[in-house]
Amino acid sequence: MKINRQRFESLMHELIDENPLACQGILSILRIEYTDQVPSLAVSLEEPPRLLINLDFLIEHTTQEIHVKSVLLHEFLHVLLNHTEQFKQMDRATNIALDAIINHIIHRSQGEDYSEFFRIYYQGQKGYASLLRPDPHGTTTDDRTLERLHLDLLSGSVVVDDLLDLVREIRKEEPAPLQLAPGLPG
């Protein structure tokens, strides 16, 4: 999708006008930075959080305006859910767990059009990373725990304790922890 700073900011303002969650999220962010220092979009783990935007990511991976709004809403939800205050460091396992919860919140609250971006972007993910993809039409796996997590994420029945259990399970599979800023690539 062809997008520049002006178009991005226009879409951000549209999202804020359309969505109370986005409006609350942006009120907590004092600064927006365009940078290639993050692979996608991210909110910094500091007070107050900064919204970091890699326009090249949006150009390469979004095909519709609603995709840009979905990614923005995803970042705003990190702020609204206090992830920027609760977590001062982010490893891959925690990032996957938090992003999976957020992507499914977007699916449940905004519908399939909004969650389409995450289904497309994460379509090739396997194992716990497949939880990043809200797929209401079913995800098939031989792993019963993973299948149950998919269903629980879709229904909204995953709570913080489940999220922390998920992080512990993901860490068991990780050979070494990766330090990542929160953001989409997970």
Regions found by a protein language model. Give the residues of each.
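Short, functionally important secondary-structure microenvironments
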Residues: 1-69, 75-186
